[in-house]
């Protein structure tokens, strides 16, 4: 946000220095990024007077100028289109550095003629992009003086950084209001001359979606002259980098920068029929007769329409975009940009002047999707003060009446109402002291809040506080405390010695455990990622039921307006982005928070894999990731935590998170506590993110994972048998509902002196087996530590195993 000192003084009686103002702005939370003083930067450029000119003997487009300076008459060669005798100009003497290009002026010979300086344009001094000619100064400018005082540049420019929640200071008036509350100057009262309307507008207004457009106002103005705006207005806008175009455009820019309320002007002679505001973007003229237009709404397969904007670009709008239409088509993208069809030009004599409030989320979503950045969008998506909208329309109307000639003005046409008064919050002295350490009397608190525009009502130790209409970010007691502190002064808060910290062993152990989890996954080829804890509510509703309390009040963007219910959407989004860049093989994880409600935040370790385990090469065809890869990674993490994954798997649960495949995922529990899930991601999720390959993931709730006390002691020595190992294959027929993992775990523990490993190599179910049965085939490695196993030993083992499987699982050996 840029503004000049003189612009600030239009609304604030102030005698403070530029430095004092800059410090005060930073103190109240409006960080000053820069103070630009053009007068100092351009102090070496002086006023000069062209006494006489004559043609250059060797160049038709160049002139030889006799220029009067404080050091006498100089000859300067100039090719500007507006160079002529008897005008005051800006001179750069020899040795001065020109801002554009950073080159120094030297005595030079141009086409055989000497030149002892340079006559400057705005572009060369980086004042604007206008290179049509040299700067012309007023006749009263004194030769030899610094030119800036005659060109309105002796006006320091403040550049402040505005946070997304402070839409109220996107106008100079709002900044003046804050400085006045700080005690730096007195806010001037806005005096508005009475506007005498001379007719009623016949243009009808229909607002189809009051939630999308809570207030829309306009006036019709006739017989105006859209001439260049006065010099004071042009200079204000130029100083903050706004190109001046015409009175109408300059006035709307002035209102937006002064009060934060975007204003739009339509050429009334290009508007046909009624105006309507809504999200039905498709319309087409089907007949035209005596200026009466009939329209038909076209519903194409994707409900889209083309919109030609004032910036010369064409945009494809959808039914989600809020538009302003007449009966001939779209005339504007609400809150963002006007259409080319009804734009004003020098010949415009009749206009419709609009001031409105639009839904901030809709404006932000459309602007982001269409990649349109305008000052109007910037302000609308940060919320407009609906109670000031009609007053802004009046101020703009008065400016048009004073600048654009003897105009006729209609009554205001309005749909919608001002914002209702907000619900009061009960604020106490004790609450302020509790969270800030500041002790103020209830009277002092009331004075500060009143200066900021808050309505207060003291009831004993409680102040009932109602936030002003322009402060959309004041919703809780902490917001009020922040307002008090920033005006009272952060520098007045006494510093205190912090208490000595006592290390919490549990926190330290938890930190070390999480670090170990990360190392385990990293050793398996997983990469760690860190993503934002906020996400789009559109994405979030695919993973959990949306809760109103998890919506952010002031999101940075519409894509980050919801507190994530799970980390998975962020990781799946990364997969989608990588696939778009032809990266197909991925394995990564994140440790981060998920939010159940405002009071419950859980820390999850979430991992995800997709693509191939290893790349194809001459020695391997590669292998795609499957559910066992993600299970293996989870198993190692769980085992490090002192648990067994097999004991945590719940096989018969059918209720899974909606984003998992219904038959290829499983819950993991420790008793009644849900620890997480693992499995394949649901195809509908993949389709939403435009992913054409399988994804497997696990989610481990670290918050619910017990912190088992670490056991230290002497490790058992690894013993390797010197005797031959034997391998036996078995196929057992068991019931379909028996878990294969449970059977394998049982065999592993069946005879620990002999069984070294058990590997599953086949599962079969089909016509060759009885109904409700399946066959599992396993390979068992048998090895004794003290002898070579004989055939008798092996047969005895087989007989015992078959009998045990029969008793435990009602299984039979397949012939």
Swiss-Prot record:
Where, subcellularly, is it found?
Answer: Cytoplasm
Give the GO biological process terms: phenylalanyl-tRNA aminoacylation
Q: What is its main location?
A: cytoplasm
Cofactor binding mode, per the note? Binds 2 magnesium ions per tetramer.
Write down the InterPro entries for this protein, in alphabetical order: aa-tRNA-synth_II/BPL/LPL, B3/B4_tRNA-bd, DNA-bd_dom_put_sf, Fdx_antiC-bd, Fdx_antiC-bd_sf, NA-bd_OB-fold, Phe-tRNA-ligase_IIc_bsu, Phe-tRNA-ligase_IIc_bsu_bact
Which positions fall inside the FDX-ACB domain?
721-814
**So which cofactors does this thing need?**
Mg(2+)
Superkingdom, according to UniProt? Bacteria
Q: What is its EC number?
A: 6.1.1.20
Keywords from UniProt, A to Z, are: Aminoacyl-tRNA synthetase, ATP-binding, Cytoplasm, Ligase, Magnesium, Metal-binding, Nucleotide-binding, Protein biosynthesis, RNA-binding, tRNA-binding
Membrane-spanning segments: none
What's a Pfam family in this record? FDX-ACB
Q: How does it assemble?
A: Tetramer of two alpha and two beta subunits.
Protein name, entry field:
Phenylalanine--tRNA ligase beta subunit
Q: Which organism is it from?
A: Rickettsia typhi (strain ATCC VR-144 / Wilmington)
Gene expressing this chain:
pheT
